[in-house]
Amino acid sequence: LKRYCADFETTTDPNDCRVWLWCTINIDDLSERHYGTDIASFFAWLPTKGLTEIYFHNLKFDGQFLLWYLLHETDFAYDEKGGEHSFHTLIGDSGIFYMIEMVLAKKHKNVDKIKFLDSYKKLPFTVKKIAKDFGIEESKGEIDYTKKRPLGYEPDANEMEYVTNDVLIVCKALRQQFEQDLTKMTISSDGLNFAKGQIGKKRWQALFPGAGCIDR
């Protein structure tokens, strides 16, 4: 299992809406960092072996760019059954994004896949607040979102630091959660799992025989 945090910086022009900078950092090895200046290079970077989880802080936003690229620039087919070389989503009726999953390859019980997840479901706060509340030394910076960034634009040092800190802050907070065995998809699922652990599996089933909870 490889786990990363990621962030897209995008243009604000509705007639030219695209990724102009992205960053990924390995949650378990913060020295592993990757950058690019368009979404094509992001997809080219994606790991192809084993299970990879990639957290975006607000998947509903970044996920729209992922889905657009999958639908328009790749030959991946949508398949809720998770067939080889396909993708599927977990999106609530109200439009809440929980997961986008790409299945790259299958061989017997071995599956190579990528799960795009929403760190906001585990850390429902702004990046600035996360840094403060978790005692993280990096702080959220500022950039000019309205600045013109044409195709081929090269990010400056401040913009690189901005995207790095945004990703690094969430990485460090998630790592603290993972070290406490808070590894579920959402904060509520983490709470449920903790309660089950405190009560015990047998007693939980006796107390709530018809709960039928989805353990995510």
Set out the residue ranges of the language-model regions.
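Conserved DEDDh/DEDDy metal-dependent 3′-5′ exonuclease domain
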Residues: 29-155, 161-165
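Short, conserved beta-strand segments within well-ordered enzyme catalytic domains
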Residues: 5, 23, 54-55
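Two-metal-ion RNase H-like nuclease active-site motif
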Residues: 2-12
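Common nucleic-acid-contacting/processivity interface regions adjacent to the catalytic cores
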Residues: 14, 149, 153-216
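A short acidic (Asp/Glu
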Residues: 14-19, 63-70, 173-174, 198
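RNase H-like nuclease fold core
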Residues: 14-33
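Short, surface-exposed beta-edge/turn micro-motifs
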Residues: 1, 18-20, 51-52
